[in-house]
């Protein structure tokens, strides 16, 4: 009887278990996923860049554009936020062919594209007429290479430059000629706003210092044969030939001076202070001089790092103005950040208040938009290289800074030399010690063998 009851009990239990297995559990409430934070809006900031990308100055135009592209790449990598939005910078590059008419055409194109700012143009001759179009549209413009003083003398509140102008450069070059013992000078310019402007400023400075101008000749920015004007200059027996123009003409001119047996030294401004000048002039450039606004890149705190990044990125050496164009972009972005706006009407005023620790200088502008206290550096061509001579002009602070940086560089070089010598001395000491140990071991071995 008990066995029967047990069987029944087991059957009931099994049935209950099966019944339980067939029941579904009520699902437990699951917390709703947290809402993802709303993505911040992105605003595209269009910066125009204009330079000759074709023709004899294309190498300089590409150099300028690369300086701007490197700056924009770094700004985008930082992920800047302005006015509550993430900013993405884009470069709109245009080719003005170093032609004033074409410069105005592409300037209007950028105005129509509603760019937030313009970096350029490269040449003074294209920058000056284009600047009126940008001014009328209220678009800020910063040039990293246009040095003719007229650019910032037009009264436009939108025009700025990040390097010394030709008044400053011409004065320094005139003073330098006197320091070199020059008594007579022949002047040649290419009739462009830059070339003629620089030559005129040099002439004023030279005459004020008592130099005699024995010839004043002209060419153009497309010429390659200068023998006619150089033959005239040869007859004057000038101590110095000053050229206001670019490297595409300066290099061949120096070469033809040598071919004609002209013994005078050649002196020019930033337009001929380039690797291209040496390439075109060859051995004829040896011993000649040129100037560049600013302090040598290798003597600037951030200079060597910038050069390494530039070469790695573009696979090319810096030609001339790339560091200044890089600074021009950075100054524009800095003004936008301070204004907390990318609207030209709102950030323009902040450009005038700039005090930016740039690559090429401590960038600040005077009431005209010119760089305050811009220095000028003199170079000499030696053995196919540009060799730094000295930094002149500019504010005492700028020159003093250059001298301090030069002294620091010399100390570093001396320290490397001392470290190298110490390393060599250490190597010799270690070698001598090793030889002594080896000799002692051999002597001990010989003594043991004798025993």
Role assignments for model-derived ranges:
Residues 2-4, 12, 22-431, 438, ...:
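Extracytosolic ligand-binding ectodomains
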Residues 17-20:
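C-terminal motif of bacterial Sec signal peptides marking the signal peptidase cleavage site
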């Amino acid at each position: 009887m008990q066995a029967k009851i047990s069987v029944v009990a087991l059957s009931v239990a099994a049935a209950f278990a099966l019944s339980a297995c067939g029941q579904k559990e009520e699902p437990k409430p699951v917390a709703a996923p947290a809402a993802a934070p709303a993505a911040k809006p992105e605003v595209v900031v269009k910066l125009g860049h204009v330079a000759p990308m074709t023709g004899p100055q294309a190498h300089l135009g590409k150099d300028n554009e690369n300086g701007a592209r490197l700056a924009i790449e770094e700004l985008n990598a930082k992920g800047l936020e302005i006015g509550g939005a993430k900013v993405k910078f884009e470069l709109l590059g245009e080719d003005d062919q170093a032609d004033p008419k074409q410069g105005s055409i592409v300037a209007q194109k950028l105005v129509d594209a509603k760019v937030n700012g313009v970096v350029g143009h490269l040449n003074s001759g294209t920058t000056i007429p284009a600047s009126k179009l940008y001014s009328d549209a209220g678009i800020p413009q910063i040039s990293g290479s246009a040095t003719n003083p007229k650019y910032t003398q037009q009264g436009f509140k939108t025009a700025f430059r990040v390097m010394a102008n030709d008044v400053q450069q011409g004065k320094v070059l005139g003073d330098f000629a006197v320091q070199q013992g020059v008594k007579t000078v022949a002047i040649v310019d290419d009739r462009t706003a830059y070339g003629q402007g620089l030559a005129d400023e040099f002439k004023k400075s030279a005459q004020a210092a008592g130099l005699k101008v024995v010839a004043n000749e002209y060419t153009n920015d497309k010429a390659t044969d200068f023998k006619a004007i150089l033959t005239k200059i040869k007859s004057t027996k000038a101590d110095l030939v000053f050229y206001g123009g670019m490297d595409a003409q300066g290099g061949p001119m120096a070469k033809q001076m040598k071919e004609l047996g002209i013994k005078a030294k050649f002196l020019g401004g930033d337009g001929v202070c380039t690797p291209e000048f040496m390439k075109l002039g060859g051995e004829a450039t040896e011993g000649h001089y040129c100037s560049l606004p600013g302090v040598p890149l290798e003597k600037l705190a951030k200079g060597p790092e910038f050069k390494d990044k530039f070469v790695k990125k573009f696979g090319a050496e810096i030609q001339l103005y790339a560091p200044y164009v890089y600074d021009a972009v950075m100054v524009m972005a800095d003004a936008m950040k301070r204004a907390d706006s990318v609207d030209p009407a709102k950030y323009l005023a902040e450009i005038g208040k700039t005090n930016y620790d740039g690559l090429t200088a401590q960038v600040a502008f005077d009431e005209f938009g010119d760089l305050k206290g811009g220095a000028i550096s003199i170079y000499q061509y030696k053995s196919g290289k540009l060799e730094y001579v000295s930094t002149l002009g500019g504010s005492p602070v700028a020159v003093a800074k250059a001298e301090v940086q030069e002294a620091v560089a010399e100390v570093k070089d001396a320290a490397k030399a001392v470290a190298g010598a110490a390393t060599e001395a250490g190597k010799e000491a270690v070698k001598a010690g090793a030889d002594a140990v080896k000799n002692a071991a051999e002597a001990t071995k010989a003594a043991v063998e004798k025993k």
